[in-house]
Design a protein with these regions (language model features):
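His/Asp/Glu-enriched, well-ordered alpha-helical/loop segment
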Residues: 5-8, 28-35, 41-120
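Active-site glycine- and acidic-residue-rich loops that bind
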Residues: 10-25, 97-99
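A short acidic, glycine-rich active-site loop
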Residues: 8-18, 57-63, 138-144
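Thr-Gly-centered strand-to-loop micro-motif
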Residues: 10-13, 36-37, 155, 161
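Surface-exposed extracellular loop regions of Gram-negative outer-membrane beta-barrel proteins
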Residues: 1-3
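C-terminal cap of metal-dependent C-N hydrolases
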Residues: 49-53, 109-175
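Terminal leader/tail segments of proteins
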Residues: 176-180
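Short, flexible, glycine/charge-rich loop motifs used to bind or transfer phosphoryl groups or to couple energy/partner
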Residues: 23-25, 105-106, 142
């Protein structure tokens, strides 16, 4: 983290490869049932100050845009695991834990028609200048992998296609409350 400076500052802090492997063990044995992202974007100057002083930088990452592609690449291409693990830990289990199941968490009648169509072989690369967030400084700049969304559907409506937001869907978001 100290090598990358402010762009890598987040809470909890980035961990060693050994720590990451242990977290994967916990996901695979069910100890960790949910995997999520605390997307905390910052203006470029808040992350990448002139001195690259990690103590002065905003404590969050611009990462949500690549969260699913990163997970897909790690689960399917690197670890050779079934992609259903992603649906379980990023959708089904969180919906159950946070009380959204019945509206979110499954592709069933009566649930919101949310889906991501993903091309498992589509290459992707994190490029700071192409981020859609408030800031464009990220410690993941240059990271590459395979498996990228081609279409995102929320409540039956296409909101993103081929890596771009659909303008007509702007403002279609909805605050989700527990259904229990």
């Amino acid at each position: 983290m100290f090598e990358k400076g402010g762009p890598a500052k987040c809470t909890p802090p980035l961990r060693t490869k050994e720590d990451v492997e242990k977290l994967w063990d916990y996901v695979l044995d069910g100890t960790l049932s949910c995997v999520g992202s605390d997307h905390s974007p910052a203006a470029d100057e808040e992350k990448d100050n002139e001195s690259r002083d990690i103590w002065q930088a905003w404590g969050g990452l611009n990462a949500i845009q690549f969260f699913l592609p990163m997970m897909f690449d790690m689960v399917v291409h690197q670890r050779k695991l079934c992609p259903s693990l992603i649906a379980k830990v990023m959708d089904y289990n969180p919906a159950k834990v946070f009380g959204f199941y019945g509206q979110k968490g499954a592709f069933e009648i009566g649930f919101d028609a949310d889906a991501v169509i993903l091309d498992p072989e589509k290459p992707w690369k994190v490029e700071q200048e192409k981020l859609f967030t408030k800031g464009h400084v990220t410690c993941f700049d240059g990271l590459e992998g395979k498996g990228a969304p081609t279409c995102t559907v929320i409540r039956g409506r296409v909101v993103a296609k081929d890596g771009m937001y659909v303008e007509e869907a702007k403002g279609f978001g909805k605050y989700v409350t527990p259904v229990r």
